[in-house]
Amino acid sequence: MQPLKGITVVTLEHAIAAPFATRQLADMGARVIKVERPGVGDFARGYDERVHGLASHFVWTNRSKESLTLDVKHDEAQKILMRLILEEADIVVQNLAPGAASRLGLSYETLSKLKPGIIVCDISGYGSDGPYRDKKAYDLLIQSEAGFVSVTGTPATPSKAGPSIADIAAGMSAYTNILA
């Protein structure tokens, strides 16, 4: 069963949280178009080479997606991206650095005026307001700040949980909120 067949997602994503959310959407039948940086793409491509020369995390979170390389720092690429969103996207997902999506004209405020009914999901470690809104976040940092590493490892050498639990939880939360 593919309840999201006919839905198109355009995503600017990297690492785990957003790719995990959009993988879930792809698994439900959505067409997911992942926009990647030229030359390197998603940095998760370089985590390891366990799956036929590809990074296991990348394969795990990016199956069933299409990939488009665009250097969104250039005006022409921004025009291509905006045309793709306005003509094709039902949903836009991003986990860029704080403020980057707004600078690219990809905020909900901007996109909803251009395309009423579009769903925009911004994934960040600290949300859009509050004292940490402009800070980047990573799984280990969030696990540490939440006190999780204090209950793993030993008192002398606390350690991160094996999987990226904060990123996976953020991705699952994003996925369920998109569906809501």
Regions found by a protein language model. Give the residues of each.
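N-terminal helix-loop segment corresponding to the beta1-alpha1 unit
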Residues: 1-180
